[in-house]
Amino acid sequence: MAHKKSGGSSRNGRDSNPKYLGVKKYGGEVVVPGMIIVRQRGTVKWPGKGVGMGKDHTLFALKGGKVEYAHKSGGRIYVNIVQMADAAE
């Protein structure tokens, strides 16, 4: 018969890799087509004019210009791209 208790296995020791979510371009920043504006899980922010949404809900620029965040009724936040000539007015 064994006189030494067997060592228990740890139930910790796991950790997931970081996903680097969040806003990548803030309001007023200049973007070119294809730039990622927001990486998110679900539709925290919605695409507006000049912004597309990927299958993982990533928002990206479809055209160049300045980023603008608009708060609409219902609590939705829309991300728009304003062209540079319009932004100067």
Curated annotation (Swiss-Prot):
Gene that encodes it: rpmA
Disulfide-bonded cysteines: none
Segments forming a coiled coil: none
UniProt protein name: Large ribosomal subunit protein bL27
Pfam families assigned: Ribosomal_L27
UniProt region (Disordered), positions on chain: 1-21
Family indicated by similarity: Belongs to the bacterial ribosomal protein bL27 family.
Species, as recorded: Hyphomonas neptunium (strain ATCC 15444)
Any one biological process term the GO annotation gives: translation
Cellular component terms (Gene Ontology): cytosolic large ribosomal subunit
A single GO molecular function term of this UniProt record: structural constituent of ribosome
Keyword annotations of the record: Ribonucleoprotein, Ribosomal protein
